[in-house]
């Protein structure tokens, strides 16, 4: 029997049964990972990280390093691969960690200094709460933001620079634009890149 999400947030250590995937044969990059409870003894509330890469994030990398952003305080941390239990089941991510995750820009995002944002990304909890917008400098960054948030957030929304919604995903499914609009856009793209606006 799975424990309720709120109980897991800092009161009891996450274990292998809380993971969707475990072992060395999986890629960790772009997923919420669970650090072993003994990495930070007495602080089981700091086990969840968004994996940003590292040579240890690749499959079958036993003692190489894994980089991650804490979903408790936003600090960047490095681990040995052997210190990672696995990837968290998305439904077990606590609300506060979802809000922290929503503020992380996609892996490989351009620095905001010297690059003008074209889109903003928002991720919402089921009750409508959100932390703040995340600036995104390209269509690729915008789509990467949606893909990294989609498994964990209730609603993900992309807006253009004028803050008009150009894409909305609810419960992992795109609801705007609908499939008919997408087919029309793909027909107009003529093999080139589609614009979200």
Predicted regions and their residues:
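Mixed-charge, Lys/Arg-rich low-complexity intrinsically disordered regions
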Residues: 1-36, 97-105
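Short beta-strand-centered aromatic/proline hotspots
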Residues: 32, 42-59
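Charged, amphipathic alpha-helical segments
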Residues: 44-51, 102-107, 137-146
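Intrinsically disordered, low-complexity, charged/polar segments
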Residues: 65-104, 173, 178-179
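Residue-level signal for glycine
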Residues: 73, 82, 122, 128-130, ...
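Short aromatic-glycine-(Arg/Gly/Cys) micro-motifs in beta-strand/loop hairpins
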Residues: 106-131
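A short, charged, amphipathic alpha-helix used as a generic interaction element across diverse proteins
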Residues: 125-128, 133-160
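Non-Sec secretion/translocation targeting segments of pathogen effectors
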Residues: 187-197
